Amino acid sequence: SKQTDFQVREKLSIVATILAMKTFLGRNESIMWVPISLDEILRVTGAIGLPKDYLFTKDALKANGKPISDDLLMMGVDVTEATPRVYLYPIEIKFSQDDIHSDKGGIQVANTYKLFAERLYGDLNFVRSVYRVFFASQLLTNLDKMKANGMVPDTCYEKIEEIRAKLLNADFDLEIGLPIKQMGAASLVTFNSGPNAVETEIVENVPICHININTPNCLNLLKDTADELKIKSNS
């Protein structure tokens, strides 16, 4: 059915985005990246036990009338200094035949970034500490899943594993923005029939990196990756 086909393509676009982002964000030297479902974060925050005013669950945010992104969060960790540095890079993914959803997607991911800035960045207080530990635990959980599935190099896993206690004690610096400023504070990734393109634009006072990926190219990327994984598993 058309709906099922669209859902499959939507899921494939998430996988393709993760693959593309690992390469794209990899240009920031010394940062190891772990993909996390934003939907999962929004779903679980309600169970932390903080007052409702502090939560950024979907229901709480809908009540404020602010559309947010619930697709993907790339969390980066840099362990080159004594105090680890952590980066948050939210990503909204839009899959369509044309560019009709891009304006809405830019606003969604800009709102998500502003929410992180408000609840996580700045001087440490009790609420920010709780949230930072929660995000760190999500990073470590996803890293463990990736390790179990052979999707993360041993060296990368071991480096983050060494600072597990620091992460879970909020003993890290949460960095605002990436070393490469042109990548913006968040990203909108669109899949359509248009050409591949990258540009940074200001949406709601937030620098958003808009990446357009040609859909046939995306499917070829996935096929090449699947073939590579098959070769690895057979070797």
Q: What is the role of each PLM region?
A:
Residues 146-235:
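Non-catalytic C-terminal interaction segments of nucleic acid-processing enzymes
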Residues 6-14, 61-72, 101-112:
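Phosphate/oxyanion-binding active-site loops and adjacent basic polyanion-contact surfaces
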Residues 34-84:
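Active-site metal-binding core of divalent-cation-utilizing nuclease and nuclease-like domains
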Residues 72-76, 86-97:
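Conserved catalytic cores of phosphodiester-cleaving nucleases, focusing on short active-site segments
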Residues 35-37, 89-93, 184-192:
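Extended hydrophobic secondary-structure segments that form protein cores and membrane-embedded regions
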Residues 95-100, 194-198:
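Short acidic, S/G/P-rich loop/turn micro-motifs used as interaction or catalytic elements
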Residues 24-30, 96-185:
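Acidic, metal/cofactor-coordinating or nucleic-acid-engaging core segments within structured domains
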